[in-house]
Structures are given as C-alpha cells and as structure tokens.
C-alpha cells in the first residue's frame, strides 16, 4: 500500500509499499559508512518498490558522485521521468529532486542550497547532510563544509542511531577549518562508537597529516587497517598512508602502496585516479623515478576523459599526462575547459582551474618561470576547485619546486619557511625541494 513510512533515522519517506524501505536504508547507511554496495542496495530498493521516489533520486545522486559526463547523463535519464510526478511528491522528495536536478544541470551551489532546505525541513535527514557536506567539499567551500553539520548537531543525541556518522562528518569539517584538536576529539568519539566509521578515520588521518604527526598517522592507519581496508574509500585512505611515507622520504614504501592497493585493480573511477596522479606527481617532485607508472596511468586517465564536469579531476589528469609527456592531451583539457565547461564548473575553471591546469602543464614541460607566475597568482584562490587542504598542498609543493628549478632560490626558501610555519611538523617535504635536493 502506498503512503508515507519513515527511514531508519525517523525521517518521513514516500513509498509505494514497505518492501523497499529496508534496502533504501541500507543504501544510505552504506554511503555514510563507506562500506558495502550502496548502488546495488538502492537498485534493489527501487526494484522492490518502484514508488520509492527518493530511491530513484538516490540512484541519480550515486551517478553524479562519479563527477563525470557519463554520470551526469545517467542521472538525467533517472531524473527526467520524475518531473511529471512532482505534484504528487512529498516535501522531502521535492527538495532532494531539486538538489539532484541542479547538480545534474551543473549548478552545484543550488544543489547544496536545496539540501540545506531539506535539513531545515528535517534536521535528521542524514542523506541530505552527507551529500551537502560532500558538495561543499567538491566546491571548496570550507566554512560551509563544517557549518552544515554544526547547525544540526543538537538534533543528534548520543543515543540516537546515526550519531557516530554525524560526529565523523563534524570532525572532518573541523579539520578542514584548522581546528585540529576538536577534530581529533570528535573523530575519536565517533570511532569509539563505531571503529568502522571510515569518514571519522579519514578525518583523523587528515589531522595527523596537517599537524605533521606522521609517525602517529602510520601507526593509526596500520592498527586500524581491518576497519577500513574493505571500504570502497580504501584507495584514498591508502593514499594518506603513502603521504606519511613520502613525508619520511620512504619512497619504496610509497611506491609499494601505489603498486599494491592504490593501483593494483587499475580502477577507472575518478576518485581513485586523482589519488594515483597526485602521488606520482609528488614522488616526481622529490626526484623519484616512477618508471612506466605515469605512462600506464595516463592510458587509464585517457579512457575516462569526457565533457568537462569537474575541473579538479582535469587538473589531476594534467598531472598524469604531464608526467607521461602527453602534451596533446594536456592541451585538449585546457581547450575543452575553456570552451565547454558549464555552470559552476565553468565559473570555477575561470577563477582558478585553468590557471592550475596551465601551471602544472608548464611545470611538466620545464617552463618553470611560467609555472611560477600562474601558481603564485592562483594559490590564494585554489580552494575553489574543491578537494581538501591536504590534496591542494600539492600546489605549494609544486610552486616551491618551480622556484627552486628556475633558480629563484630566495622565493623557494621563503615558500618553504611559510609552509614550515603553517605546518611545523611537516617541514621536511618542502625542504627537500630546495635546489640540490630535487632534480
């Protein structure tokens, strides 16, 4: 019988029957925990109950998470048939439909705003909370990444199911805004509640990275590996482990992780490809010979090139193509983003993305002075392309290396000093890039 049920967290859910609700809940919980098969779960939910409208919208969300042209097209195919049904939708379904529709249309800001309205409608809508934070992450809107969780914290007492997920989300927001002590407290509270909370583990890994507590980071991820290694987010966690080894100049260990859990499966998902490109780029900055790895990664990257959708991805593709010497593909990405980017991505590309693409391409080609000009101008607004502070740290590292290789020793030393002051425990990586330590 059609009607309104509630999901696992007590939020109303418009359904055609009871059959799909548990499967829908499993899909949302899988997204929150970063474990399991969320796509399979939501497909099973709508197969059991085609009237589960939010299930169809979640299918679209999962396609959009791919941050690719193919993902957008798949989402549009799911969302378009729902337009005629809008008059019969509940408030929650309407707000989520608007969010997914805006995201698919390229208006990522409006998508986030619709999810904020969904949280005003019901502050315990965990689906809205998770996707809103992820969108703010994609948008580089660091303050909103934290505040969207702050506003609903009081709605989540410790005894309520889902509390641990909310603590993990809040921990990551605190970390990205530089409140490392509070981030660690909330992350550890979440992990005490649920040791398999991958987002909380991720937040704590970021704290260790940003504070230069490398030994603690290695120990934490090693001791907790059984809790996160089966996650579909595991490649990114292994990337953090590799960064710790890189900070300690343990290049063989970092390469071993690259060859093992990071690239063994040769995933063609952007979330995995960007980690691979970033790691190889950083290793090369340190003068490490990565062999044929860059050529192999470039082949994989070339397979997923599509209409420009998220310039953060294309920036990392430039890293891979630059290392492999594929100037034609670098130029294609620059041209495509200038001519065909739309919506939020077009604005972000104009503000910072194009400068990052050209700056990294220039560095790869040995045009270090041009790289200096571009990266110096863009570094203060690079956050708009999205990603975390740890991911965007590669901008400063590349600028230091460019200054060093261009013979701008004074600039290089000042940049290293600035980075060391900002991250006292992580000064070694910058220092190695000074003249004589990198080639």
Residues covered by each model-derived region:
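Canonical tetratricopeptide repeat
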Residues: 58, 131, 169, 203, ...
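Generic helix N-cap/helix-start motif at coil->alpha-helix transitions
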Residues: 18-23, 51-53, 89-95, 122-129, ...
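Intrinsically disordered, charged and Pro/Gly-enriched terminal/linker segments
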Residues: 5-22, 84-96, 101-102, 409-412, ...
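Internal metal/ion-chelating core segments
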Residues: 148-248
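Helix-coil-helix junctions within alpha-helical repeat/solenoid scaffolds
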Residues: 242-439
